[in-house]
Amino acid sequence: MIRLALFDLDHTLLDGDSDVLWCDFLIERGVLDATDFGARNAQMERDYRAGSVSTQDFCAFYVSTLAARPRTAWEAFRLEFLDAVIAPRIGPAARALLQRHRDDDDLLVMTTATNRFITELTAGHLGIEHLIATECELDADRNFTGRPEGMLNMRDGKVDRLQAWLAQRGLTLADCDATFYSDSINDLALLAAVQRPVATNPDAQLAAVAAERGWPVLRLHGTGRTA
């Protein structure tokens, strides 16, 4: 049986939300309008934490930030974003957890609702070879259209995308001893689908579910979220 270690990114391995931080970063650089995107970004984060935003609206809003420039123009931005914003927010406890699973010869997979363009450098930085993320639509010139593509990797979609990823390798979840680390009630479907769910820095709703179901709770940074 394959040992699978699945990791959500935002508020789990990362102390923060990479979508929200990306918007803030682009606003600070003058790429996005502070009045428009700043308010919408803050509201989207609140709605996501409450579990009240639709998967389509959430993913579409953040992917839309990539429509402002040609794809090649984003490379310098995302490299700076990784170095200046993301890497400092991934603490030693998260890195030690990843290393422990490597030492156990587990197959490491990052699964995130955030789009691939933003998160693939983070996965590489952490030495996670496999990434399941929301995909971005490209036009004929290979530039971002500002729309997500295919099945969104959020809520039930995380289960479906994982199953599809496993099927490409001739596997099913039944073939795996799977552990999944997540902070969010939005990931309840995948947490319930694996053998070893771990509520990690859980939001209030997930903490309540974890207590009810007897799931372990792990703190990787700070004292955990309360909203």
Language-model regions: role of each:
Residues I2, A76, D83-A227:
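C-terminal cap/substrate-recognition subdomain and adjoining C-terminal extension
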Residues A50, Y62-L66, A140-D141:
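Active-site phosphate/ATP/adenylate-binding loop shared across adenylate-forming ligases
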Residues D57-P92:
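Metal-dependent phosphoesterase signature
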